[in-house]
Regions:
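Beta-sandwich interaction modules
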Residues: 6-8, 19-34, 68-131
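Short, solvent-exposed secondary-structure boundary/capping segments
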Residues: 62-66
């Protein structure tokens, strides 16, 4: 069952530098096996760091979460001519970022959430996922 759901809605910086969203079901929660999750992150003058975290446990504790690799839209060519996609764990914004960007993460994740840290300014308009 493909669906677009909100991981994190409209949030304005209030002086708190960290925020963790509620968890949402990933592919494995719904029995899908391709593991493809497409993210859309909409920011307005945001300064901080965003991580997408995942768990493969049905009832996760704090220790069951890990940082998912996020494949961006930047491509690189290595010395053999192979074209690869850049992969990140953190999306770090050290100057005000206003953008809407898409990323992919792949894994048979039961749960997915967003973790925001070092937030010093701006707005997170939304973080959505299509699984």
């Amino acid at each position: 069952m493909r669906a677009t759901i909100s991981i994190l809605g409209y949030n304005v910086f209030t002086g708190t530098s960290t925020l963790v969203s509620d968890k949402v079901g990933g592919d494995a929660y719904f029995g899908a096996d391709d593991g493809l999750h497409t993210l859309m992150i909409d920011l307005d003058s945001f300064i901080g760091s965003i991580k997408i975290q995942a768990s493969i446990v049905k009832t996760p504790t704090d220790d069951d979460w890990f940082n998912a690799e996020i494949a961006g839209t930047t491509f690189a060519v290595d010395t053999t001519g192979k074209v690869g996609t850049s992969v990140a764990i953190n999306l770090d914004y050290t100057s005000a970022e206003t953008s809407i960007k898409t990323y992919n993460t792949v894994g048979n994740f039961v749960w997915i959430r967003a973790s925001i840290s070092n937030w010093t300014a701006g707005i997170i308009k939304r973080i959505e996922i299509n699984r």
